């Protein structure tokens, strides 16, 4: 080959070792003279453009392993709930959008799996599919609070519009979890599925009219309503069975009642209390005979005349309230009673005021059925004083002895104590 540079015409062409490949390079202009390269001349090098590494390898980039595991978990959930292929694809697309969002890039793997469940839950809500968030959280082994926070963050980050599912459709799917068909349990316990759904939905409408359903999670109230409806369909034979016994008879899933027994019992007592208030307004029943353990025998009549009984109960309560107010105003020691009530309600912030009664002129006294936030008083926050620990506190002998375990340490401590006492 010629020893002259084709760019500048210089004859100062030397051999240069580049790693394991030898090249001929011009010393004057620096161009590569040897063949076999993409660019061999200085003019070609001047017109070239640098390409970033991530751009050159974008076509061959593999998806992240966390994204792949999230997709597999999402598709497994879709198969469990038997979603259609279109809903499954929509859930996968939504999960991919959420996964690449900056708010979800640096979260843990467990939270990314919860994010996949939240994406499927949102698609189910859009298609009016009756799926509970608690059921998805149970399958993902996630806390309800944690799943709720991630779902709220998902809707805020992607500007998603949440849709509400009809409570009757949710109730139907909930009632089918109880195995109460004639071929599954004894005849005493069996009930038609549609009849149970109708009775439970009527009880839920009553709960909504009396503010029991307001601001509450649906699971505990659903279970309490199903239990009361099951008892009311054959009260004489089923009154002796408790709520937990009913769950075992119906083979209800454990996630429905095991973790929230206290909440379910509270909703059950509230529902029975409302039924007792309305049952006392029935003209053929003596009010003294109405009790919470026997009111299920009157559920059919109460639900049949629900609207009329609600009006009668409110009217009788307002009438009794007017009579009590007139009797109080007729007393001569009215001012003393007001001052005593005010002094009773003034309690220090560190004490619970659950037993404190509201003053007579409070608006909550004028209504029979109230929302839960009005019926129950809020617990006052206890501001604990911070512990002032400086590290210079004296340590008692009993506390020192509690840290000693072996006999050798006791002997060493006794010797050291004797030496200290000598000085």
Curated annotation (Swiss-Prot):
Gene3D superfamilies: 2.20.25.10, Cyclin-like. Residues 325-340 have a biased composition (Low complexity). Sequence repeats lie at residues 171-245. InterPro entries: BRF2-like_C, Cyclin-like_sf, TFIIB, Znf_TFIIB. A zinc finger (TFIIB-type) spans 1-34. Signal peptide: none annotated. Zn(2+) binds at residues 5, 8, 26, 29. It is found in: Nucleus. Pfam families: BRF2-like_C_cyclin_rpt, Zn_Ribbon_TF. In response to oxidative stress, a Cys-residue is reversibly oxidized to cysteine sulfenic acid. This impairs formation of a ternary complex with TBP and DNA and down-regulates expression of target genes in response to oxidative stress. GO terms for cellular component: nucleus; transcription factor TFIIIB complex; transcription preinitiation complex. Keywords: Activator, Metal-binding, Nucleus, Oxidation, Repeat, Transcription, Transcription regulation, Zinc, Zinc-finger. One of its GO terms (biological process) is regulation of transcription by RNA polymerase III. One of its GO terms (molecular function) is TBP-class protein binding. The modification Cysteine sulfenic acid (-SOH) is found at residue 373. Coiled coil: none annotated. PANTHER family: TRANSCRIPTION FACTOR IIIB 50 KDA SUBUNIT (PTHR11618:SF5), TRANSCRIPTION INITIATION FACTOR IIB-RELATED (PTHR11618). General activator of RNA polymerase III transcription. Factor exclusively required for RNA polymerase III transcription of genes with promoter elements upstream of the initiation sites. Contributes to the regulation of gene expression; functions as activator in the absence of oxidative stress. Down-regulates expression of target genes in response to oxidative stress. Overexpression protects cells against apoptosis in response to oxidative stress. This is Transcription factor IIIB 50 kDa subunit.
